[in-house]
Amino acid sequence: MIRVTVWNEGVHEAESREVAAVYPEGIHGQLKSFLGAQEDMEVRTATLREPDCGLPPEVLENTDVLIWWGHKAHDEVPDELVERVHDRVLRGMGFIALHSAHFSKPFKRLMGTSCALHWR
């Protein structure tokens, strides 16, 4: 069984009726719905506004793959969480960055660059 955690800021759904209409359960909920239909996946979700951004140590320890959807609240992710995600990836957890997550704090920490589109 692959243990997947889908993380989403949850900001767009909260701020935009149009986005909320398309993703009534949030973007993370839509991804969970699709991935959860796979027989070999156990899927949970986490969002920025939850305690520990939904990713306390016990959740990360029980995650095989972390899917990270980010767009505009990158700076709101606490540095302590970034370090926990970084450590967990170094110990084997997969990390999939979606949408603008190339600019998320965990992805930048993992890549060791600014990850700006013009960084080179």
Model-derived features: positions:
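Short alpha-beta junction capping motif
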Residues: 60-105
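An acidic, glycine-rich "communication" segment
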Residues: 102-120
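Aromatic-Pro/Gly-enriched surface loop or interdomain linker
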Residues: 1-62
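Short, glycine/charged-enriched secondary-structure capping and boundary segments
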Residues: 19-22, 58-60, 80-84, 110-113
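Active-site alpha/beta core segments
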Residues: 50-52, 59-60, 89, 109, ...
